[in-house]
From Swiss-Prot:
Positions bound to FAD: A69, A72, T91, K92, S98, T100, G105, A221, D275, E440, S456, L457
Pathway the protein contributes to: Carbohydrate metabolism; tricarboxylic acid cycle; fumarate from succinate (eukaryal route): step 1/1
Record protein name field: Succinate dehydrogenase [ubiquinone] flavoprotein subunit, mitochondrial
Record-listed N6-succinyllysine modification sites: K179, K250, K335, K485, K498, K538, K547, K615
UniProt topology in membrane: Peripheral membrane protein
Amino acid sequence: MSGVRGLSRLLSARRLALAKAWPTVLQTGARGFHFTVDGNKRASAKVSDSISAQYPVVDHEFDAVVVGAGGAGLRAAFGLSEAGFNTACVTKLFPTRSHTVAAQGGINAALGNMEEDNWRWHFYDTVKGSDWLGDQDAIHYMTEQAPAAVVELENYGMPFSRTEDGKIYQRAFGGQSLKFGKGGQAHRCCCVADRTGHSLLHTLYGRSLRYDTSYFVEYFALDLLMENGECRGVIALCIEDGSIHRIRAKNTVVATGGYGRTYFSCTSAHTSTGDGTAMITRAGLPCQDLEFVQFHPTGIYGAGCLITEGCRGEGGILINSQGERFMERYAPVAKDLASRDVVSRSMTLEIREGRGCGPEKDHVYLQLHHLPPEQLATRLPGISETAMIFAGVDVTKEPIPVLPTVHYNMGGIPTNYKGQVLRHVNGQDQIVPGLYACGEAACASVHGANRLGANSLLDLVVFGRACALSIEESCRPGDKVPPIKPNAGEESVMNLDKLRFADGSIRTSELRLSMQKSMQNHAAVFRVGSVLQEGCGKISKLYGDLKHLKTFDRGMVWNTDLVETLELQNLMLCALQTIYGAEARKESRGAHAREDYKVRIDEYDYSKPIQGQQKKPFEEHWRKHTLSYVDVSTGKVTLEYRPVIDKTLNEADCATVPPAIRSY
């Protein structure tokens, strides 16, 4: 770490001069601005003023660049470095501050440590959980790879909770079954107490230090560098010293996480601002299925902090003001461990019908105090602490007040199961050369219309690794990096300059709050056409208000006002596509529940035998992916659709799961 400390001293010594005469600081020739976490090397970099004399740009060249250093980004980055690729990792946060750290419940894999299990049963549950909007080839790949992925993490040193005989402990989780839904509740969720994400992220970070990856830490990625339909790297802002960097690479992996902060109440970190999703949009590429936003059933009432599904997996129950275990009415078999969309809607209905708890009757209770205190202390130690801090509740004596809270984005950047980003042209999927995506930023689509709990950490490691393997298959370390135009990234720098000196009438924080409240009010657990239409108008107006922003910090050193404004631009693009996609989808499927279109509209009516039915044309049913585009200059949203992939990778080994009516 001596290299990190040395660079910190260097930057601190120059900070005052940089603030006073920033444009001249970079004009002294070649120098390295970034660092490797282990301090072993500096990549060569050259300064040029080809874009602007006011904003000189530092140019770098790598075999591959990964944007984001959460679970997916780290796994992709060190997978590439391990294969010999000269790899950069650009992240606006230090890696262990990424939002992966907040995941609590666990990671699904059919290890069979608690009872007989099979990855094909996991495959079935995931397809069913997706409400048949998931692509079955990608789900096949993820669930088959899951056991090996968990064993790999164990070999990296991840300290999984253990059974008495030393095996990885696996808890029950929502939507998980045995024998294709006919064998009862599965115990498939591998965990580290209730801090699995924290453990996973630190394990991957520790592993990454073995490899010679160049980390650009606290660098904000502004845009992709696109040339002739190919991705050739990214342009980024160094938050610490205000320098601009073009990182040219033959392969670019986007792993920037979700965009939960489009909503007022969410479990996401304040840094979950959809940066990669917005970069894809500005590049003229589509995003997929952004209308599918998961509400986690158990966010702490009034605070929004996550209470893991593992609480219910360990035996916790949801109760209403009458003391009823109400999930028995809505999901007679799975009860409190039905899929998240089912539980969130059931809770909302209980509150609507007057059975909510508290003085306002606007939440329900999660009861844990019937469980043995030693079980709570061993399996749910973090939850006990969180409940006391944010709700003032001793979980051994009283229930936790909870309410559905925005938690996860099923949609994102469309990819295939290899992590390659797709565009849809003339009815056919086409790969975008040089561009990959993984993690919550991507939409493979393994989650479809609703993600099963504990499939997200699995998604990170499986598809982060898949991106590295795909690049290894198609490229060699040291391959020539395609050139970029001398002024590549010029628009990004112009936008940054415009925001830096924005002198309108609306603060960034005010506009962000208006957007978040509009999304919360108009695109929540239950949706209706008239409210969605009103929401579309409001978000479009707010998008137009971006040109009236006012920023206050004109400097370039740690200008968080500027960074938050750049993040707001990204959030707005995500919000537009989310609410317009939701308004257009005239059905209820998974997390998208329309009160004016209460049924799922498939190519057949699967509540009846399909023999004798005429298949609906593609234009008349909704079992299809939404592709959304935004004209960045006007905010106009354009929607297209692409078919769901029903075929698995090997039908003889893993049969397709045909659509059916979903019940738990």
